[in-house]
Amino acid sequence: MLWKLLRLFIIIKLIQLAIIYFSPCQFDTSSELIIQNLSSTSSSKSYYNVIITTILNKLIVWDSVYFNDLFINPIQFEHQFVFCPGWIQLIKLLNIKNYYTAQLTSILISNLCHFASVITLYYLTNEMDMKFGLVSGLLMIISPAGVFLTGNYSENLSNLLTLLMFLTYYKSINFNDVKQPSNKSITNILGYIISGIFCAINFTVRANGLLLGVIYVFDLYHFIQNKSSSQIILSIITGSILFMTFLMTNIYHYIKFCPGREWCNNTFPSLFQFAQHHYWNVGFLKYWTPNNIPNFILVLPVLIFNIYSLGYMYQELPKNRKLLPLIVINGLIVVGGTFFWNIQILNRITSFSPLIYWTLAYNLKKPWAKYAIGYCIVWNFVQTGLFAAFLPPA
């Protein structure tokens, strides 16, 4: 099993790196400024050969411009706070002084997280009483997130933490406890609390991880049905780990910037919400403009497949009640991405969702599934070329 996954993983990554290396030029050359700035001293020059250095330079596009800057320099300005600190601080902990070494290290760690996510999905699939763990893992390797899972974006670490949360959660819950009115009970207290810790850490890596907390709201509702005070308290404690992380993050932002900024006087003074709205044009239907039609077209296959997966897995609920929290979480991400956020990010931020891989695995023998897999493979490489040229989608 491990060798089959690793073999495809290496093949896909090598092809992507080859495309990046041989891509002729970049549409936007602004990333050269950060390269010149961060590698200006002799101690920050590249120690690596021309192939590795060229690939590293071409991977500094879109959000990677910010990540590579923040791996070396502190977060100072409001707009930088949309990049949650967890992934950045992990690289900073390594205390790497050379810019190129920091970038290469972050890429290697990111890819290790990608492969660890694939392995975790394999075990999660088995935990959900499904028989296609290997197929699901292979499908995650060719995820439409593509080259974003090869560069040093935060998606891979977030995906790994999300899947570890799901795995520890499902190992800690009995969904067939006939003694309880909700048929649901906690069987492993430590595992359940650990799932909450993974959830909270994930929020420090990607802010949309806050939506994962809905899983503990479901639990609270079910345990109230059970009239089990101990399990009610456990669900509140575990969910509160995420809530306290969210609260402390906002308190830190307030102490750092307030009262001098306009958002400090809001009813709920959130720097992240302000920065997303003010600097990144995030808000209800704000992205629904004619100039963004190409981004809607680029994300349409992923959007359609996510919606189809939600419907397909909803039909599976009578046979597998465990799916409900995953359906709700995936649905919230799709709604947020479609109506509130920059829609093209759905290409990468839905890569955590087991539902899309399970739906494809369920229907593997159907003709449309072969077309879907073909699309994933082709899109991986087309997107890599676009990424290397600093072209959308971001």
Curated annotation (Swiss-Prot):
InterPro entries from the UniProt entry: PIG-V/Gpi18
GO terms for biological process, alphabetical: GPI anchor biosynthetic process
EC number per UniProt: 2.4.1.-
Keywords assigned by UniProt, alphabetized: Endoplasmic reticulum, Glycosyltransferase, GPI-anchor biosynthesis, Membrane, Transferase, Transmembrane, Transmembrane helix
Subcellular location: Endoplasmic reticulum membrane
Membrane topology: Multi-pass membrane protein
GO molecular function, one term: glycolipid mannosyltransferase activity
Transmembrane segments: 2-22, 47-67, 104-124, 132-152, 185-205, 232-252, 293-313, 323-343, 371-391
Pathways per UniProt: Glycolipid biosynthesis; glycosylphosphatidylinositol-anchor biosynthesis
Cytoplasm as UniProt keyword: no
One GO CC term on file: glycosylphosphatidylinositol-mannosyltransferase II complex
Biological role stated in the UniProt entry: Mannosyltransferase involved in glycosylphosphatidylinositol-anchor biosynthesis. Transfers the second mannose to the glycosylphosphatidylinositol during GPI precursor assembly.
UniProt similarity note: Belongs to the PIGV family.
Name of the protein: GPI mannosyltransferase 2
Species this chain originates from: Candida albicans (strain SC5314 / ATCC MYA-2876) (Yeast)
